[in-house]
């Protein structure tokens, strides 16, 4: 005796009472003959990979549902109760459907970024004890000197003695043209005693810049004290 092959379509037909109950829970009604027609003849023409013996693959059921719910003339509103019942059997399977439900594939891993090639380590440039030669630029101008170079040595006014100066007075000659003793330049002849006494009375003595003199005080006409350059005893 040969064994019959169980398919998703034959499995639903063998548990038709459960299929009607699940459809009722979705608020729809299904008929057995139209169930077979849509599963084996209509949905395979949607070109989404639906097999004639039916499937519990959730991705294929979702693709057929999109075709059925398409708006306009491309939709199939008469097939809505049947694809909704197939979806309920796959997403909330009863015990007799679980062995045929395809396990949900794991989510695809995100594409990993291509690994970049490792950069070779930077080699340390060899050190050299030689320094580059500094060449003067052609367009560089010489810096002006603060003091002009006169060829003579500079004198440090703080640490060195000043140079000797030439005496402006001419050297005295031994004798004048008359054969007598020449009087040194800048020296006046000695005055006579009588002239010195008369000059002392007429001219006031020259005040020395290094000494100070005190003059007597006299009361003026307005009652203020004034300095008098001489006293009555000097007369």
From Swiss-Prot:
Keywords assigned: Capsid protein, Host-virus interaction, Lipoprotein, Myristate, Viral budding, Viral budding via the host ESCRT complexes, Viral release from host cell, Virion
Span of the annotated motif PPXY motif: 162-165
Lipid attachment, kind N-myristoyl glycine: 2
PTM comment text: Specific enzymatic cleavages in vivo yield mature proteins.
Composition skew (Basic and acidic residues), residue ranges: 163-178
Gene3D superfamilies the UniProt entry points to: Gamma-retroviral matrix domain
GO BP of this protein: viral budding via host ESCRT complex
Span of the annotated motif PPPY motif: 162-165
Composition skew (Pro residues), residue ranges: 108-124
Region (Disordered): 108-235
GO cellular component, as recorded: viral capsid
Superkingdom of source: Viruses
InterPro entries documented for this protein: G_retro_matrix, G_retro_matrix_sf, Gag_p12, Retroviral_Gag-Pol_poly, Retrovr_matrix
Record remark: domains: Late-budding domains (L domains) are short sequence motifs essential for viral particle budding. They recruit proteins of the host ESCRT machinery (Endosomal Sorting Complex Required for Transport) or ESCRT-associated proteins. Gag-p12 contains one L domain: a PPXY motif which potentially interacts with the WW domain 3 of NEDD4 E3 ubiquitin ligase (Potential).
Task performed by this protein: Matrix protein p15 targets Gag and gag-pol polyproteins to the plasma membrane via a multipartite membrane binding signal, that includes its myristoylated N-terminus. Also mediates nuclear localization of the preintegration complex. Capsid protein p30 forms the spherical core of the virus that encapsulates the genomic RNA-nucleocapsid complex.
Comment field (misc): This protein is synthesized as a Gag-Abl polyprotein.
UniProt protein name: Gag polyprotein
Organism in which the protein naturally occurs: Abelson murine leukemia virus
Gene: gag
């Amino acid at each position: 005796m040969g064994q019959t092959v169980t398919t998703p379509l034959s499995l639903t037909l063998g548990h038709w009472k459960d299929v009607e109950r699940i459809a009722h829970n979705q608020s729809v009604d299904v008929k057995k003959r139209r169930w077979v027609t849509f599963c084996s003849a209509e949905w395979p023409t949607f070109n989404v990979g639906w097999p004639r013996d039916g499937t519990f693959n959730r991705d294929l059921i979702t693709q057929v549902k999109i075709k059925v719910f398409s708006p306009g003339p491309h939709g199939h509103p008469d097939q809505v109760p049947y694809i909704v019942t197939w979806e309920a059997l796959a997403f909330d399977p009863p015990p007799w459907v679980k062995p045929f439900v395809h396990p949900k594939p794991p989510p695809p891993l995100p594409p990993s970024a291509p690994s970049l090639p490792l950069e070779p380590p930077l080699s340390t440039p060899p050190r050299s004890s030689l320094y580059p030669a500094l060449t003067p630029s052609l367009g560089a101008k010489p810096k002006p000197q603060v003091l002009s170079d006169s060829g003579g040595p500079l004198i440090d006014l703080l640490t060195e003695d000043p140079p000797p100066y030439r005496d402006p007075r001419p050297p005295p000659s031994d004798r004048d043209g008359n054969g007598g003793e020449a009087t040194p330049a800048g020296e006046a002849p000695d005055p006579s005693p009588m002239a010195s006494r008369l000059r002392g009375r007429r001219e006031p003595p020259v005040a020395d810049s290094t000494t100070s003199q005190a003059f007597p005080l006299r009361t003026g006409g307005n009652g203020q004290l004034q300095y008098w350059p001489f006293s009555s005893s000097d007369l």
